[in-house]
């Protein structure tokens, strides 16, 4: 019984001493500087990673353009021209106002069709 009490007392004493040493330890300014530098380096690494990712994403476009033959370039130019023409034609004729519609067109209005 005495040995059990002694073991419990020694265990409690060691825990109290360990906690006292940890809380009473002076803070090291070098440790704080090291942590701040490591946090700053991590932020720099994220920016660097974003930069390299942007470079990697732009590289396949460059290699594809270099690998294109003159025939492919002419086809690509034709496709671009067709796309521009479609955009121009879509933008040149805006949607007509309801009053400018042709006579005889029908709109759905409250359960019935009405002519314009």
From Swiss-Prot:
GO terms, biological process: cell surface receptor signaling pathway; cell-cell signaling; chemical synaptic transmission; digestion; G protein-coupled receptor signaling pathway; hormone-mediated apoptotic signaling pathway; hyperosmotic response; negative regulation of cell population proliferation
Positions bearing Alanine amide: 43
Disulfides per UniProt: 105-116
Start and end residues of each stretch annotated as Disordered: 62-82
Record Pfam families: Somatostatin (PF03002)
Molecular-function GO term, any one: hormone activity
Keyword Endoplasmic reticulum: no
Positions of the pro-segment in this chain: 25-88
Signal peptide extent: 1-24
Compartment(s) of residence: Secreted
InterPro entries, A to Z: Somatostatin, Somatostatin/Cortistatin_C
Similarity comment: family membership: Belongs to the somatostatin family.
Protein name: Somatostatin
Annotated source species: Homo sapiens
């Amino acid at each position: 019984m005495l040995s059990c009490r002694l073991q419990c007392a020694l265990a409690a004493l060691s825990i109290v001493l360990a906690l006292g040493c940890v809380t009473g330890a002076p803070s090291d300014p070098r440790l704080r500087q090291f942590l701040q530098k490591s946090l700053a380096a991590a932020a720099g690494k994220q920016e660097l990673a974003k930069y390299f990712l942007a470079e990697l994403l732009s590289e396949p476009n460059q290699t594809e353009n270099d690998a294109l033959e003159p025939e492919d370039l002419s086809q690509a130019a034709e496709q671009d021209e067709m796309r521009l023409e479609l955009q121009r034609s879509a933008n040149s004729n805006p949607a007509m106002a309801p009053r400018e519609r042709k006579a005889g067109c029908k709109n759905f209005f409250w359960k019935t069709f009405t002519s314009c």
